[in-house]
């Protein structure tokens, strides 16, 4: 492979790593939370749905660890987790108890993710990450060797991402010292989890989808973000449904395009609680006697759904010792 080819491959891998470490909005299913109307409507054998539940109950990063366990081992360890979820020890898991557990799992995943990458950026080991440290760790080679990027497609990507990262870093830096504490760096990597970062999430989403640069998202841009029309055939039914969603529910003022407020309403709905929705879904699917609470037996009878949900951090909690949970 020629030197230029190797460089392009290396830069591509570097960029993929940079983007993987960040929490910016990307594809369709990362932008849109699942509406309540979908809960309880999917068939039990839907493996994709099970994966969603597993990620909710266990944690996305570690769901693959569930594959290490036999069904009997999974049920045994899941039973121990159920005892932790049942905070009042009455033998019944309520939707509220399940919701609080899922929120705990979500929060732990986020902070574990930050801990994994912290040392890569905290070069001077002072328990803070300055903007300069982050910039050098992420873009140092690009900044030091601009000529190598001049004619590559990566040049435009890095040139765009650097100021965007700086803008997000400054938004997360509440005291304005251009140095991030762990909490501030968590807000930088996971802005969707912090109220003061919501405007950045909206702005970055707009920039990602608004291809003609007019400051709005029209219907074609909205569809292009989730569907690549590579041939001249008819659009799938789900795309036609999304066009209807755009017209009926996304475009609130009916001007044919989405402004920032409409984008915010779309990707960050104020009346939607993900953990509450997932907890309701798990109860709905497992509550055999329809008393709106779950016994340990009901959960273990539907173990395959739970070990694939955020409540067990996608299986990670099943491989941990009891004291770690």
UniProtKB/Swiss-Prot annotation:
Residue ranges of domain EF-hand in the record: 73-108, 109-144, 160-195, 197-232, 238-273, 274-309
Biological process (GO), any one: camera-type eye development
Positions with a binding annotation for Ca(2+) 2: 122, 124, 126, 128, 133
Post-translational modifications reported in the UniProt record: O-glycosylated. O-mannosylated by POMT1 and POMT2 and elongated by POMGNT1.
The entry's keywords: Calcium, Endoplasmic reticulum, Glycoprotein, Metal-binding, Phosphoprotein, Repeat, Signal
Keyword match Disulfide bond: no
Motif (Prevents secretion from ER): 322-325
Residues noted as binding Ca(2+) 3 in the record, renumbered to the chain: 173, 175, 177, 179, 184
Binding site for Ca(2+) 1: 86, 88, 90, 97
Molecular function via GO: calcium ion binding
Modified residues (Phosphoserine): 49, 74
Residues bearing attached sugar chains per UniProt: 47
Binding site for Ca(2+) 6: 287, 289, 291, 293, 298
Family matches, as Pfam families: EF-hand_5, EF-hand_7
Gene3D superfamilies: EF-hand
UniProt: Ca(2+) 4 binding residues: 210, 212, 214, 221
SMART domains: EFh (SM00054)
Amino-acid positions noted as binding Ca(2+) 5 in the UniProt annotation, renumbered to this chain: 251, 253, 255, 257, 262
Family: Belongs to the CREC family.
Stated role: May regulate calcium-dependent activities in the endoplasmic reticulum lumen or post-ER compartment.
Note: This protein has four functional calcium-binding sites; potential sites II and VI have lost affinity for calcium.
Protein name per its UniProtKB record: Reticulocalbin-1
